[in-house]
Swiss-Prot record:
It comes from the Bacteria. Keywords: Activator, Cytoplasm, DNA-binding, Transcription, Transcription regulation. The keyword DNA-binding applies. The gene is cspLB. CDD domains: CSP_CDS (cd04458). Its main location: cytoplasm. It is found in: Cytoplasm. SUPFAM superfamilies: Nucleic acid-binding proteins. InterPro entries: Cold_shock_CspA (IPR012156), Cold_shock_domain (IPR050181), CSD (IPR011129), CSD_CS (IPR019844), CSP_DNA-bd (IPR002059), NA-bd_OB-fold (IPR012340). This is Cold shock-like protein CspLB.
Amino acid sequence: MQTGTVKWFNSEKGFGFIEVEGGDDVFVHFSAIEGEGFKTLDEGQSVEFEIVEGQRGPQAEKVTKL
């Protein structure tokens, strides 16, 4: 698992990016956020996640808020 900080997240479109210290930003889709109900992330929020290879490059999976 990796940790990072939410760079930005658009709740209307359902995606954003997570900033990883010493690495490239990672794409995150709302479907990768763990938990029930409305899934969104706040800018500056700390998260833990796994990186998988998506169709357009690395993306976050199993995202949990810290």
